[in-house]
From Swiss-Prot:
Basic residues composition-biased segments: 138-151
Domain of life: Eukaryota
Keyword Phosphoprotein: no
Ranges of compositional bias, category Pro residues: 79-94
Protein name: PHD finger protein 23A
Location(s), subcellular: Nucleus; Cytoplasm
Keyword annotations: Autophagy, Cytoplasm, Metal-binding, Nucleus, Zinc, Zinc-finger
Entry's family note: Belongs to the PHF23 family.
One GO MF term attached to the UniProt entry: zinc ion binding
Lineage: Eukaryota, Metazoa, Chordata, Craniata, Vertebrata
A cellular component annotation (GO) from this entry: cytoplasm
Function: Acts as a negative regulator of autophagy.
Region (Disordered): 1-31, 50-198
Domain-related comment: The PHD-type zinc-finger domain is required for negative regulation of autophagy.
Length: 278
């Protein structure tokens, strides 16, 4: 009785097949070979290496083998028939997320190969070289100015003119109109004896600097002749600059009296006007 009871299986115990099916299959850990297969597939997809004749999905692990297969096998069971090797499946295109990952990997590899692994662009170096050239040109201009000055401080007008020369003209801006020399001389002739009048008169110098009368001082302004146009007084025969006498070159009178002779003459006498309108 004991043998029969021990030999018989209780109806409450589940069969062995149900025990093995109820347990989840164990996941196999990835190996170096799996990683190499994945890399070779990515390189073949990107076109870096030729596609092998037999492709396998590297990221799909082979079917897990249940460890309870040996327990299921029994001496009384019939042996499994030999299975023929299945034909290789055609390569399936990877999912969309896998494609985006592969494309990102390929783009990074191409950018690193083209740029030599450097992320800096050569444009920054070119900009720095241009700035250095500009600074060097400015320094040479300053040295030239110091040489021309010779220890004397330049006037504000000269500094402004140099700044205008250094500053590039804006596109679309027109140059300032320049008046002819005749207009400038006529405009400056009726004014007071200022530096501007002297500069205008200097343009009409008719005598060379080697003449003996170049340094002759006769005018009451105590300035030399220096080749500037002058007029002679009819009384004292003193030569006076036209700018000091306030006479225009286009309206030189035939008779001229200097300031001293004009003041010493009789009050009833009439004197020709030097500043008659043209």
């Amino acid at each position: 009785m004991l043998e029969t009871t021990m030999g018989e299986a209780s109806p409450e115990d589940p069969p062995l097949n149900l025990k093995s099916l109820s347990q989840p299959p164990q996941k196999r850990s990835r190996t170096v070979e799996d990683f190499n297969r994945f890399c070779s597939f990515v390189l073949a997809y990107a076109g870096y290496i030729p596609t092998p004749a037999k492709e396998e999905r590297a990221w799909t692990p082979p079917s897990s083998v249940s460890p309870h297969r040996t327990e299921e096998s029994d001496g009384w069971d019939s042996p499994d028939p030999p299975q023929l090797p299945a034909p290789p499946e055609p390569p399936q295109p990877p999912a969309t997320s896998d494609i985006s990952t592969i494309e990102t990997f390929v783009m990074k590899a191409k950018s690193q190969g083209a740029g030599g692994g450097s992320s800096k662009m050569p444009g920054g170096q070119e900009d720095g070289a241009e700035e250095e050239e500009v600074q060097a040109k400015k320094g040479s201009r300053r040295k030239r100015r110091q040489r021309h000055r010779g220890g004397v401080r330049m006037s504000d007008t000269d500094t402004d003119e140099e700044e205008r020369e250094e500053r590039p003209a804006a596109p679309g801006s027109l140059p300032a109109p320049q008046l002819p020399p005749s207009a400038e001389s006529s405009r400056d002739g009726g004014g007071s004896s200022s530096d501007a009048d002297t500069q205008v008169m200097d343009e009409d110098i008719m005598v060379e600097s080697g003449d003996d009368s170049w340094d002759l001082v006769t005018c009451y302004c105590e300035k030399p002749f220096a080749g500037r146009p002058m007029i002679e007084c009819n009384v004292c025969c003193t030569w006076v600059h036209l700018s000091c006498a306030k006479i225009r070159k286009s309206n030189v009178p035939d008779v001229y009296y200097c300031q001293k002779c004009r003041a010493g003459r009789l009050p009833g006498a009439t004197t020709p006007k030097a500043d008659s309108a043209p």
